[in-house]
Regions:
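Catalytic cores of alpha/beta
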Residues: 108-115, 170-187
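Alpha-helix-loop-beta-strand connector modules within alpha/beta enzyme cores
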Residues: 79-95, 144-159, 214-237
Length: 247
C-alpha cells in the first residue's frame, strides 16, 4: 500500500518483543515451524519514521500510518523513537491517521503516545480469558491485566480502539469465549473488532487451549459474529484499520 500510494502504510520500528506468540509471524526459534517474514533488524530514527509517514500522508487521501507490523516485534518497546516521531509528524500536519498495532503490554507508554498525537490503537487478543491468552501469547514482563488497562486507557483518552481478535473456529466460537468477549466489550471501550484468522495449526491450537480451559461445543463463527453484532450494534466489524474520518 505504501508503494502503491493508498490506504494504510506500515511503519515498522521494533526489533524486540515481550510476547512469545506460538504462531509469531516474524520469529520462530525452534525451527519446528517457519516464520513468514523476517523481523526488522534495526530501530529507525525519529527522523526516518517522520519522513516516511509524511510522504504517505501528504499524497494519500484519508491515509493511515501504522506502527506494529508483522515484520517487527512490539512497537511499545520502541516508544523512545515513536513518541518524538509522532510529535514531529503532528507539528507538520493534522492530516492522516496515526495508528499503533500492539499487544498493549505497557499502558503507561501507550498513554504517552496518545498525548503525543496517536489517533488509534489496535490491541491483539486471542481470547478474553487470561489462561487462554497466556497460553498463546506467553507474555514476558507483562500481564493480561496490562492489556486490559491499555484498552481502558484508550477509552479514557477518547481514542479509537480496535481489537485484533485472533480467531480459530472450534475454540473462538464456543459459549465460553463468546461470554468472555461480551463481558469485555460491556466493561471496556471497544469501537471495532477485526476478525483475524489465526495463522496456526487448528488441531494443535485446540489442544493447547483445552489444556488450560474446557471449551464447550462450538456454535459456529457466523452465529458468534451475528450475536456480537446484535448485542453491540454500535461496534464496527472489519479487517483493516480505518482512517479517523470513518471512526
Amino acid at each position: 500500500n505504501f508503494f502503491l500510494g493508498r490506504y494504510e502504510a506500515p511503519l515498522p520500528t521494533s526489533p524486540r518483543c515481550n510476547a512469545r506468540c506460538l504462531g509469531c509471524l516474524s520469529l520462530q526459534k525452534t525451527g519446528e515451524i517457519s516464520h513468514s517474514q523476517d523481523r526488522i533488524a534495526f530501530k529507525p530514527t525519529p527522523k526516518e519514521i517522520t519522513q516516511v509517514a509524511l510522504f504517505h500522508i501528504e499524497r494519500v487521501k484519508q491515509s493511515v500510518v501504522s506502527f506494529g507490523q508483522g515484520c517487527e516485534g512490539d512497537p511499545l518497546l520502541a516508544a523512545d523513537v515513536i513518541e518524538p516521531a509522532i510529535k514531529e509528524i503532528r507539528s507538520k500536519t493534522r492530516r492522516g491517521t496515526i495508528n499503533i498495532n500492539t499487544n498493549g503490554s505497557r499502558p503507561g507508554i501507550l498513554a504517552a503516545l496518545f498525548d503525543a498525537g496517536l489517533d488509534s490503537v489496535r490491541i491483539s487478543l486471542n481470547s478474553s480469558r487470561k489462561p487462554c491468552y497466556d497460553a498463546y501469547f506467553r507474555p514476558k514482563g507483562y500481564a493480561f491485566d496490562d492489556v486490559i488497562k491499555s484498552i481502558e486507557t484508550a477509552g479514557i483518552k477518547k481514542k479509537f480502539v480496535s481489537v485484533n481478535y485472533l480467531n480459530c473456529p472450534g475454540f473462538t466460537d464456543t459459549p465460553e469465549e463468546f461470554d468472555a468477549l461480551s463481558e469485555l466489550m460491556r466493561a471496556y471501550p471497544v469501537n471495532m473488532i477485526q476478525w483475524r484468522n489465526l495463522n496456526f495449526d487448528p488441531k494443535r491450537y485446540w489442544k493447547i487451549m483445552s489444556a488450560v480451559s474446557r471449551p464447550g461445543n462450538p456454535m459456529g463463527m457466523h452465529r458468534i459474529i451475528s450475536r456480537i453484532k446484535e448485542s453491540f450494534p454500535d461496534v464496527k466489524h472489519g479487517y483493516f484499520n480505518p482512517p479517523k474520518e470513518k471512526f
